[in-house]
Amino acid sequence: MGTTTLAWNINNTAENGSYTEMFSCITKFNTLNFLTVIIAVVGLAGNGIVLWLLAFHLHRNAFSVYVLNLAGADFLYLFTQVVHSLECVLQLDNNSFYILLIVTMFAYLAGLCMIAAISAERCLSVMWPIWYHCQRPRHTSAIMCALVWVSSLLLSLVVGLGCGFLFSYYDYYFCITLNFITAAFLIVLSVVLSVSSLALLVKIVWGSHRIPVTRFFVTIALTVVVFIYFGMPFGICWFLLSRIMEFDSIFFNNVYEIIEFLSCVNSCANPIIYFLVGSIRQHRLRWQSLKLLLQRAMQDTPEEESGERGPSQRSGELETV
């Protein structure tokens, strides 16, 4: 009798401990998803404002075209995260899970390409200014953005088809090959982003001809730093998905939720960066319109030089795409 009671107590304690641990995991999971929804909604509002201002209220230059498309990619990415997190928290039917997966991949790749393109083009404009201003085709930014959207969509659809996300067809080795191709694509973009940003920094800080730091340089630098710390882990985790799930799916789910939250912080941070950079060195304590702040963040002329120019001259600088 005593042995039976002891065994029952041990089993009961083990079950209670397992239940407590499971309840704790569910609570953390729901809390993280709830925070993701809050951050994503804030980011949707911020990127929506940037889209609205750049599309309809500001003249666009070569770089603001990329910023406009980056805001579009961030908006799409955050929207998918809101839908996915709400489905998890409310325990809704997730029949759309794989569709959201493809759209998330599409938006993430497009956003990374836009940031890499901004950094690379800014580096070219500083390293070889004469060639850049004289030889650069007029509609390069628009063409590059179109290519980015198309290539990101095609790559996402091919991965979705090959890995069984869209249809029942699934080829393990083909899926792994696609994952390696996509990972290589990410590595190339990351190298372009890192090298161009580092070269730009070296040129500005240690170059023989000192180049003044503009608001737009600060905007690019902060955007790149935030992406490396908050956005890059999502890409690393995403394309290790098949390998991680083979070893420990629980570990992957926990890590993935955290990284998903960080990537939402990255997409939410970009509009905040624009408006904060636009408000730097404003001595007059008065409310500045978001349009004016965003225009200042896109300003690629030194502070002293831009202060001497009239409004018509400054707006003229923003018309070349």
UniProtKB/Swiss-Prot annotation:
Pfam families: 7tm_1. Residues 299-321 are annotated as: Disordered. This is Mas-related G-protein coupled receptor member B4. It comes from the Eukaryota. It is found in: Membrane. Residues 1-33, 84-97, 168-172, 237-257 are extracellular. The keyword Membrane applies. It is a multi-pass membrane protein. Residues 55-62, 119-146, 194-215, 279-321 are cytoplasmic. GO terms for molecular function: G protein-coupled receptor activity. GO terms for cellular component: membrane. Belongs to the G-protein coupled receptor 1 family. Mas subfamily. Orphan receptor. Probably involved in the function of nociceptive neurons. May regulate nociceptor function and/or development, including the sensation or modulation of pain. Keywords: G-protein coupled receptor, Glycoprotein, Membrane, Receptor, Transducer, Transmembrane, Transmembrane helix. Glycans are attached at N11, N16, N94. The chain crosses the membrane at residues 34-54, 63-83, 98-118, 147-167, 173-193, 216-236, 258-278. PANTHER family: MAS-RELATED G-PROTEIN COUPLED RECEPTOR (PTHR11334), MAS-RELATED G-PROTEIN COUPLED RECEPTOR MEMBER B4-RELATED (PTHR11334:SF36).
